[in-house]
């Protein structure tokens, strides 16, 4: 099974105290593969150049993204890229971005999002 990581998913460990990879291991079948769109990597790099908690979260997110396979795409914006890559790969997306989640559901793409304080849950469209 393939999983695409969104920018805010990679920032969850710092911002929301979510043990991202432990949670994915808990809810996904063994052998799942992680992918990250290039636009997400670019967004993390931009955010990490700032100051404060968001910059720290983005910096940690960029480090965590190294566990995923980078994917090139046509879309210019990170959310569009996540949708494009998920469609192409037939993947589930990890995001806590409500507008993106709604777009993914409309496209028939499953979403893993926050449930409760720091637990992830997979939802079908």
Predicted segment positions?
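Domain-level signal for Mg2+-assisted phosphodiester chemistry and nucleotide/NA-binding surfaces
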Residues: 1-67
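Nuclease catalytic cores that cleave nucleic-acid phosphodiester bonds
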Residues: 39-125
């Amino acid at each position: 099974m393939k999983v695409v990581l969104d920018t805010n998913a990679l920032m969850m460990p710092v911002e929301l105290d979510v043990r991202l990879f432990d949670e994915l291991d808990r809810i996904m079948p063994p052998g799942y593969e992680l992918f990250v769109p290039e636009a997400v990597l670019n967004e993390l790099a931009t955010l990490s150049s700032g100051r404060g908690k968001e910059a720290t979260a983005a910096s940690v997110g960029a480090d965590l993204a190294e566990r995923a396979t980078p994917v090139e795409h046509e879309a210019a914006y990170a959310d569009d890229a996540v949708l494009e890559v998920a469609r192409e790969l037939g993947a589930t997306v990890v995001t806590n971005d409500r507008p993106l989640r709604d777009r993914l559901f409309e496209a028939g793409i499953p979403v893993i999002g926050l449930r409760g304080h720091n637990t992830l849950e997979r939802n079908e469209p």
